[in-house]
């Protein structure tokens, strides 16, 4: 399986905290192994995401990246491919098979404020999840779902403290005290 990382552009403390947190959690839940945050360095947000990942299992990483183009360029220099999610790109459902056929690791770039043209130019694919304005969280979730062929439903996260057991009614949560 390909390695998927996410790059969140231009985080702003206070204004973007909730949406960036949701981008991080969505990345993790849908199979990414790491997220890079650019913009303002938000230690509290990063610690909250690490804490959530620790409690719910897996090896998800979060890293601050002052220079987002440095992340993109290094990714490409190491043979990786870049997918930039934008409402102006090729339709996700039409391009995802091409992305899947690539044997390269994938960096998904999710915008914040106005995305500079150099991000569009550096992307191997500019990808749209519909051609309508909506949330970067929903774009990320839909694209990762397509990229994973729905296999994110079968992901197992190692050493969780909390583990939800699917049930039609009520809540069923296993608590693994040994992982605290």
From Swiss-Prot:
Membrane-spanning ranges: none
Keywords, in A-Z order: Cytoplasm, Methyltransferase, S-adenosyl-L-methionine, Transferase, tRNA processing
Gene Ontology terms, MF aspect: tRNA (cytidine(56)-2'-O)-methyltransferase activity
Annotated positions binding S-adenosyl-L-methionine: 85
GO cellular component: cytoplasm
Reaction catalysed by this enzyme: cytidine(56) in tRNA + S-adenosyl-L-methionine = 2'-O-methylcytidine(56) in tRNA + S-adenosyl-L-homocysteine + H(+)
InterPro entries: Alpha/beta_knot_MTases, tRNA_m1G_MTases_N, tRNA_mtfrase_aTrm56
Localization in the cell: Cytoplasm
E.C. no: 2.1.1.206
Enzyme superclass (EC): transferase
Annotated CDD domains: aTrm56-like
Cross-referenced Pfam families: Trm56
Any Gene Ontology biological process: tRNA nucleoside ribose methylation
Main subcellular location: cytoplasm
Record flagged with keyword Membrane: no
Keyword Transferase: yes
Family of this protein: Belongs to the aTrm56 family.
Binding partners and assembly: Homodimer.
Function statement: Specifically catalyzes the AdoMet-dependent 2'-O-ribose methylation of cytidine at position 56 in tRNAs.
Protein name: tRNA (cytidine(56)-2'-O)-methyltransferase
Annotated source species: Methanobrevibacter smithii (strain ATCC 35061 / DSM 861 / OCM 144 / PS)
Lineage: Archaea, Methanobacteriati, Methanobacteriota, Methanomada group, Methanobacteria
């Amino acid at each position: 399986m390909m390695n998927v990382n996410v790059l969140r552009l231009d985080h702003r403390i206070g204004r973007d905290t909730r949406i960036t947190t949701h981008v991080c959690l969505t990345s993790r839940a849908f199979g990414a192994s790491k997220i890079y945050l650019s913009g303002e360095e938000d230690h509290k947000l990063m610690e909250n995401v690490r804490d959530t990942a620790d409690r719910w299992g897996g090896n998800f990483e979060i890293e601050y990246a002052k220079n987002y183009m440095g992340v993109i360029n290094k990714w490409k220099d190491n043979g990786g491919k870049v997918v930039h999610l934008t409402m102006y790109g090729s339709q996700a459902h039409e391009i995802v098979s091409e992305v899947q056929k690539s044997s390269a690791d994938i960096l998904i770039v999710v915008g914040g404020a106005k995305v500079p043209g150099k991000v569009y130019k550096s992307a191997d694919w500019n990808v749209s999840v519909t051609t309508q304005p909506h949330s970067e969280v929903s774009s990320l979730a839909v694209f990762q779902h397509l990229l994973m062929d729905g296999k994110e439903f079968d992901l197992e996260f190692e050493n969780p403290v909390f583990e939800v057991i699917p049930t039609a009614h009520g809540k069923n949560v296993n608590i693994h005290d040994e992982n605290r």
